[in-house]
Amino acid sequence: MGQSVVVLGAQWGDEGKGKIVDLLTEEIGAVVRFQGGHNAGHTLVINGKKTVLHLIPSGILRDDALCLIGNGVVISPAALIKEIGELESAGVEVRSRLKISPAAPLIMPYHIALDQAREKAAGGKAIGTTGRGIGPAYEDKVARRGIRIADLHYPAQLEELLRTALDYHNFVLTKYLGVEAVDFQKTFDEALAFGEYVQPMKSDVAGILHDLRKQGKRVLFEGAQGALLDIDHGTYPYVTSSNTTVGGALAGTGVGADAIDYVLGIAKAYATRVGGGPFPTELDDEVGQGIRDRGAEYGASTGRPRRCGWMDIVALKRAVAINGISGLCITKLDVLDGMEKLKVCIAYEYRGKRTEYAPLDAQGWEECTPVYLEFPGWTENTHGITEWDKLPVAARAYLRALEELAGCPISIVSTGPDRDHTMVLQDPFA
């Protein structure tokens, strides 16, 4: 049987998953996206060339890797066409290697209109979504009024589904949110055209994955966002609309629990968050700005500045437990170069008591004050180092402390954005 590895974020997203997925896709059978949409922004740097992927799995830059989009992903037709076009214009063969589940829901124009109108109406209480229709598309999926890839090939059924959806959503858009209605004919024509475009890529993703496992091929499941943004286990309501944790890899592709052999959790050597929501270790000072500048902490999808803070072990341990993480990958170690001292949150002060467990609600998180452990920094340059023994003593001590505090071994350390700026201490596929 083949080996399957799930790669997922162990913080609030933007941990560097795309680079690690690309690194691990050498000699791979397939890479599969299992949740989220084009709100994800996976940045790859290979030989100094930067590529940002939003929907297509990060294995697309490997010539022999099959790339799959599972039923758990919500697909924007316009975003997918644009991304395929950009890659193919750069000489990357996409359509012959990309397979998409017919059960994947579509992000329709009314989902985008709803998302943006709601955020505007919420004002200061906005969640901080990307405004790309992800949440409303998942809402329709659960409400059983979603339009899926499979529906595009039955025009009469598609027309009925679309009219029903627009009757509902246009009422909300015009009567409640006070914005313009979405036009039926334009939306219908665009959907039919996309159906023709995507037809050659439509495939039974679950069946492909089962066959690959029987053939002994390696499969990598690529998560988007991070565990602490999970719709069920994150800082609700400041979360994304899908299951970003390991359970999402199963439900979002159609494989069983026995198909997962290793879970790799990606975490930065510090912490970041985009948008609203609790962030106990956030640094609203020159230290936080320094990390933001050195780490280029601006969203790949939105360009928004990310909130920056110290490593939060309480939150990381929660991600390790929820996902059954087998090993950690610590990224952006080099961003901490030159800092005199580092802090790691090892517990919270919560309502007068010390706790090593995170509250289960956003309000509780907001009331938490971090308890820090200090570590000496290092002045040496770690950028691009690929051997453990060549890291500064203080950097090695910091990593070993993270490993011990999180109760999980570190498998990979990243010291720069390029694929080659990486040291693999334990191969997840070994």
Curated annotation (Swiss-Prot):
Q: Which residues bind Mg(2+)?
A: 14, 41
Quick one: which residues bind GTP? 13-19, 41-43, 306, 332-334, 414-416
What SUPFAM superfamilies does this protein map onto? P-loop containing nucleoside triphosphate hydrolases
Active site annotation, chain numbering = 14 (proton acceptor), 42 (proton donor)
- Molecular function GO terms recorded: adenylosuccinate synthase activity; GTP binding; magnesium ion binding
Under the heading InterPro entries, the entry gives: Adenylosuccin_syn_GTP-bd, Adenylosuccin_syn_Lys_AS, Adenylosuccinate_synth_dom1, Adenylosuccinate_synth_dom2, Adenylosuccinate_synth_dom3, Adenylosuccinate_synthetase, P-loop_NTPase
Description of how the protein assembles with itself and partners: Homodimer.
Q: Look up keyword Cytoplasm and say if it applies.
A: yes
Name this protein carries in UniProt: Adenylosuccinate synthetase
Subcellular locations according to the entry: Cytoplasm
Tell me the residue numbers annotated for binding IMP.
14-17, 39-42, 130, 144, 225, 240, 304
Annotated organism of origin: Xanthomonas campestris pv. campestris (strain ATCC 33913 / DSM 3586 / NCPPB 528 / LMG 568 / P 25)
A Pfam family hit: Adenylsucc_synt
Instruction: Give the residues the record marks as binding substrate.
Output: 300-306
Task: Identify which cofactors the protein needs according to its UniProt entry.
Answer: Mg(2+)
Q: How is the cofactor bound?
A: Binds 1 Mg(2+) ion per subunit.
Q: What does this protein do?
A: Plays an important role in the de novo pathway of purine nucleotide biosynthesis. Catalyzes the first committed step in the biosynthesis of AMP from IMP.
GO biological process annotation, one example: 'de novo' AMP biosynthetic process
Q: According to its UniProt record, which protein family does this protein belong to?
A: Belongs to the adenylosuccinate synthetase family.
Known EC number? 6.3.4.4
Chief location category = cytoplasm
Quote the catalytic activity from the record: IMP + L-aspartate + GTP = N(6)-(1,2-dicarboxyethyl)-AMP + GDP + phosphate + 2 H(+)
* Keyword annotations: Cytoplasm, GTP-binding, Ligase, Magnesium, Metal-binding, Nucleotide-binding, Purine biosynthesis
